[in-house]
């Protein structure tokens, strides 16, 4: 595990606006990703993740503008994912101020994307986002955890544990592990999945999906996560970043 646990808010951006409701009374415009990023920076976020949910080429320039405006205001690492298909996409995001870039579906379709990006920019730049779920009924994977796409709607038949190992070999710098079963439930992270991935990879794991309260975060770290990511509980003001860090610290882990 890395020395200090990182707490990372995630913002879904659609055509330059934040989607999934965000409730901060002190913001003029809760739909502006740059304002929200600045608010989380003030709250003590260690990093920020933007997910471009439109991610079509027509909106790529909008996202580039959002990233460059954000990078002028916040001084913590910024990861941008969604619709990244080529090393050129990575290049344009890094040039406008992203520190790391997330890949998902494009890497499943062409795993060489991981090695091409890692060789050109360094593996510290590359975050592999994995949307995994437990297989129901008949199992097609050895581990029982399957990679999905389309926000969990489409099965790939790929074993999630095999995929993270392969991605590490190809040069991924981090794994953003999102449990599609836990996502949105606010019932806690999928600890078994985190443990299963931790056994197989040495690179950092960012746990995502399922956080509902501050006390949900320390068990994810205990299970092997190096960083924890959440969206709605931060956006709705249910829990602050400070409260999450306090809970992690109280459990005996180091925070920044």
Swiss-Prot record:
Enzyme class: lyase
GO biological process: L-histidine biosynthetic process
UniProtKB keywords: Amino-acid biosynthesis, Cytoplasm, Histidine biosynthesis, Lyase
GO molecular function: imidazoleglycerol-phosphate synthase activity; lyase activity
Catalysed transformations (reactions): 5-[(5-phospho-1-deoxy-D-ribulos-1-ylimino)methylamino]-1-(5-phospho-beta-D-ribosyl)imidazole-4-carboxamide + L-glutamine = D-erythro-1-(imidazol-4-yl)glycerol 3-phosphate + 5-amino-1-(5-phospho-beta-D-ribosyl)imidazole-4-carboxamide + L-glutamate + H(+)
Top-rank taxon: Bacteria
Pfam families attached to this UniProt entry: His_biosynth
One Gene Ontology CC term in the entry: cytoplasm
E.C. number: 4.3.2.10
Record has Ribonucleoprotein as a keyword: no
Pathway entry: Amino-acid biosynthesis; L-histidine biosynthesis; L-histidine from 5-phospho-alpha-D-ribose 1-diphosphate: step 5/9
Subunit details: Heterodimer of HisH and HisF.
Family: Belongs to the HisA/HisF family.
Protein name per its UniProtKB record: Imidazole glycerol phosphate synthase subunit HisF
Organism: Bifidobacterium adolescentis (strain ATCC 15703 / DSM 20083 / NCTC 11814 / E194a)
Taxonomic path: Bacteria, Bacillati, Actinomycetota, Actinomycetes, Bifidobacteriales
């Amino acid at each position: 595990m890395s020395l200090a646990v990182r707490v990372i808010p995630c913002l879904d951006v659609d055509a330059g606006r934040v989607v999934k409701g965000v409730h901060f009374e002190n913001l003029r415009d809760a739909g502006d990703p740059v304002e929200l990023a600045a608010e989380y920076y003030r709250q003590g976020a260690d990093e920020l993740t933007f997910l471009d949910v439109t991610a079509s080429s027509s909106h790529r320039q909008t996202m580039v503008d959002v990233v460059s405006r954000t990078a002028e205001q916040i001084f913590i690492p910024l990861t941008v994912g969604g619709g990244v298909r080529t090393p050129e996409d990575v290049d344009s995001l890094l040039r406008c101020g992203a520190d790391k870039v997330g890949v998902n579906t494009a890497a499943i379709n062409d795993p060489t994307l991981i090695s091409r990006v890692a060789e050109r920019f360094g593996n510290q730049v590359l975050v592999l986002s994995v949307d995994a779920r437990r297989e129901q009924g008949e199992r097609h994977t050895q581990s029982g955890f399957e990679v999905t796409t389309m926000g969990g709607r489409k099965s790939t038949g790929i074993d999630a544990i095999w995929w993270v190992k392969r991605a590490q070999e190809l040069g991924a710098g981090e794994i953003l592990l999102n449990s599609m079963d836990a996502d949105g439930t606010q019932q806690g992270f999928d600890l078994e999945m985190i443990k299963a991935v931790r056994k197989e990879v040495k690179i950092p794991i960012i746990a995502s999906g399922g956080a509902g309260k501050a006390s949900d975060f320390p068990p994810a770290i205990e299970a092997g996560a190096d960083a924890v990511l959440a969206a709605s509980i931060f956006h709705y003001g249910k829990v602050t970043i400070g409260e999450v860090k306090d809970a992690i610290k109280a459990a005996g882990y180091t925070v920044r």
